[in-house]
Amino acid sequence: MSLKDRFDKFIDYFTEDGDETEVQEQTVSRPAAPVKQKPELVQPKPVRESKPAPRPAAAAKPQPKPQPKPQPQQKSSTENITRLHARQQELAQHRANADEKITIDVRYPRRYEEATEIVDLLLANESILIDFQYMTEVQARRCLDYLDGARYVLAGNLKKVASTMYLLTPINVVVNVEDIRLPNDVEISEFDFDMKRSR
């Protein structure tokens, strides 16, 4: 009895109400009754079991079918990634062929929620210059982390341009930034990609 009490206490620990386990036990016991009725239905069918070869073959076929189903799901996820990269390369070729001026959108986000708008611009194959000067340090860290994740998924580039400015570009744009040194008397809090203080 003490072992049973320990198990009951263990189950009660993970459930808020002890009645839930009793309800589950009752639902389990109820399906057991219909299972008993199914064998009764199977008993009249032994007459048809004189043809055992088609039945085992039919029973063997459903088992291989569930195994190929997970593989198409894996293939579909890799196909989605492949389509995304193909779309990015298609946009890169289209932009290379077109003789249009490349514009860079400048954004001054004030809230973390504006990061999704910036990612939408990246999806539209736009370059975005982001200045975090109007955000608090914590919000800027969150926003930069979100944008870095989006950049990784969309195969873009994220470069630090100034102490609070970052350039987010699609895959087809190459950015060469020289290291800009500020005079020693200017105090500006600088952050790396992980937004840790570099001092």
UniProtKB/Swiss-Prot annotation:
Protein's UniProt keywords contain Lipoprotein: no
Gene3D superfamilies: SepF-like protein
Coiled coil stretches, renumbered: none
InterPro entries in the record: Cell_div_SepF, Cell_div_SepF/SepF-rel, SepF-like_sf
Keyword Cell division: yes
Annotated compartments: Cytoplasm
Main location per the UniProt record: cytoplasm
Region (Disordered): 15-79
GO cellular component: cytoplasm
Function: Cell division protein that is part of the divisome complex and is recruited early to the Z-ring. Probably stimulates Z-ring formation, perhaps through the cross-linking of FtsZ protofilaments. Its function overlaps with FtsA.
Stated family: Belongs to the SepF family.
PANTHER family: CELL DIVISION PROTEIN SEPF
Assembly description: Homodimer. Interacts with FtsZ.
Protein name (database record): Cell division protein SepF
